[in-house]
Structure formats: structure tokens, C-alpha cells
């Protein structure tokens, strides 16, 4: 396990690397042209990319912080979520996007904001809801750790199946990360590297029945993706370690701001249509989305907006 000191805490390099791969996949298939051109590949990626993100998030969320520190962390997930989801919802009522809202009323606005978010911001909504439940169970109930995790699972089931506040499947991926954290075992001891994981992943991906994150095959695909990615890291890292880790450490910025650029990149489809596979469009769009999101974050740091929006002086995390 490789660790790096960053901002006064220890970082696991492999997790930053995984987050880089996952955010690039997320942006790629939020490009409508790519999603429409490769629908099966999109379905495969959607089976595992956000579930793995949530496992990592559950593992990294430290409920042993003081209540003030922990709730401050959640607050600065909530503030960007409220700002960006509000903007996205209004935009969805004005632009002819896939999630277009025909008539935006006050009730529809708050239904999207509080219960059923649009765009990629549902991830932050899930993080805040699951994080609050996690805090409540682990701070307010003096149970044995195993009992707390069982209770947390029941709370997630209540919120998901009966309350409709979060996806129960995604909440349980978050719970998996929590369980790993409290097991006393490193996440890299749970997810072991293997080159053969690629063959098993491809075999499972050939059968549509596996392409659901709640299906046994989908859960296994998430594990196999991580296993193969970790096996490839020593090789890929020889050349691309610094840019991969830089992107991986700034996934929040990319999650928040990349939708602005995925919409703008629609205008590139026609000029780049001479390349029939769409790969040129994909590469150019990824550069624009990643660079644009990082530049916005850098400007927010420069203008001292980051303390209000992200809760820290510098939101752009350097290598």
C-alpha cells in the first residue's frame, strides 16, 4: 500500500488512482453522444462505477471525528450539492436535455432537490443522507460495532425501500465501505489485485442479466473491476502516476463542474464527426471537461470563494 502525506492526513494512492478511473468513466458516459453511440458499454460502466465510488466513500468517511468536525464535512458536501443541483434543475427546465422538465413548479423543484436529484449530483445527496444516518447510529446508540452496522443497514433499508430518499442498492454499497473500515482490515486487503479479474469481468459483462448493480453478477463485476485496476496500477503508474493521482484527488470538483462542460461539448459532435468512432470527440471532450472543472476550482481558490463553498482555503488539491 502506497501512502502519501497530503493536507495533514495520510492518503492511499491506490484509492486516488481508482477515483481517477471512475470519474473519467462517469464523465465519458455523461457525454450524450458517447452514451448513445455505445449503449452496451454505458450499461456495463453504470453497473460498477458509482457503486465502487460509494464503497470508497463509506470506507473513507471517518465517523470517529468529533461531532463538529464530522458535521462540518457533511455541511460542505451539502452546500455544493444544493447550489449545483438547484442550478441543474433550473437548467433542465430551460434546455432540451435528456432530463428535461416540462413544467418547473416549486413542488417539482424541491422534490428534485430533496428526494430525487437530477444529473450526477445524486451521489452527493446519497453521501449526505447516508453520512447523517451513519453519524446518528454510531454516535447516539451505545451498541457493539456489529450491532451498530446491522442497525445502520436497517436504517438504510428504511430510507431506501420505504422512504424513497436514497437508492437502497447505493446505500448498501456505502455500508460495505463502512463495514470494511470498522473491520480493522485495509481496503486493499479486501480488494486484491489480479490480472485474471479482467477475463472474469468480460465474461460476466457478456450477459445482460449481470448488468445491474444490485445483481450478484453486478456486485462481482464491481469487485473484479477494482481487482484488475489495482493489478494494472504498478504498470500504468510508471508513466501516468502524477496526472492520475492529481485527477483522483480532485474528483469532487470534477463531479460538481463537469456537467457544465458535457453540455457545452455537444457542439463538438458535428465538427468532429469526420472521425466515425467518436473516440476523437471523447478525448477532446474529456480534456475540456477535466481542464474546465479544475480551472473553475482554481478560480474559486483565487477569489477566496472556496472557504464558503468547499469549507477550505484551497479546494484544488495539488499532487
Could you say what each language-model-derived stretch is?
Residues 1-319:
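Alpha-helical transmembrane segments and their immediate juxtamembrane cytosolic regions
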Amino acid at each position: 500500500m502506497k501512502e502519501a502525506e497530503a493536507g495533514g492526513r495520510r492518503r492511499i494512492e491506490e484509492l486516488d488512482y481508482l477515483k481517477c478511473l471512475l470519474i473519467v468513466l462517469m464523465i465519458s458516459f455523461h457525454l450524450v453522444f458517447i452514451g448513445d453511440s455505445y449503449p452496451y458499454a454505458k450499461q456495463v460502466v453504470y453497473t460498477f462505477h458509482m457503486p465502487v465510488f460509494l464503497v470508497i466513500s463509506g470506507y473513507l468517511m471517518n465517523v470517529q471525528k468529533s461531532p463538529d468536525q464530522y458535521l462540518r464535512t457533511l455541511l460542505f458536501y451539502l452546500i455544493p450539492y444544493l447550489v449545483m443541483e438547484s442550478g441543474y434543475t433550473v437548467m433542465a427546465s430551460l434546455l432540451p436535455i435528456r432530463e428535461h422538465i416540462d413544467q418547473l413548479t416549486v413542488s417539482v423543484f424541491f422534490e428534485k432537490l430533496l428526494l430525487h436529484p437530477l444529473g450526477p449530483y445524486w451521489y452527493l445527496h446519497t453521501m449526505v443522507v447516508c453520512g447523517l444516518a451513519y453519524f446518528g447510529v454510531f454516535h447516539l446508540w451505545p451498541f457493539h460495532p456489529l450491532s451498530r452496522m446491522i442497525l445502520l443497514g436497517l436504517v438504510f433499508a428504511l430510507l431506501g425501500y420505504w422512504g424513497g430518499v436514497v437508492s437502497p442498492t447505493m446505500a448498501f454499497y456505502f455500508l460495505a465501505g463502512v463495514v470494511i473500515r470498522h473491520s480493522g482490515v485495509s481496503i486493499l486487503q479486501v480488494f486484491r489485485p489480479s490480472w485474471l479479474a479482467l477475463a472474469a469481468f468480460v465474461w460476466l459483462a457478456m450477459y445482460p442479466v449481470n448488468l445491474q448493480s444490485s445483481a450478484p453478477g453486478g456486485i462481482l463485476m464491481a469487485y473484479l473491476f477494482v481487482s484488475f485496476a489495482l493489478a494494472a496500477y504498478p504498470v500504468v503508474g510508471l508513466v501516468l502516476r502524477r496526472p492520475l493521482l492529481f485527477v483522483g484527488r480532485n474528483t469532487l470538483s470534477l463531479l460538481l463542474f463537469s456537467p457544465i462542460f458535457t453540455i457545452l461539448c455537444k457542439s463538438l459532435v458535428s465538427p468532429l464527426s469526420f472521425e466515425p468512432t467518436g473516440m476523437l470527440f471523447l478525448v477532446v471532450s474529456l480534456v475540456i471537461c477535466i481542464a474546465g472543472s479544475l480551472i473553475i476550482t482554481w478560480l474559486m481558490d483565487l477569489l477566496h470563494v472556496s472557504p464558503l463553498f468547499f469549507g477550505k482555503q484551497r479546494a484544488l488539491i495539488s499532487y
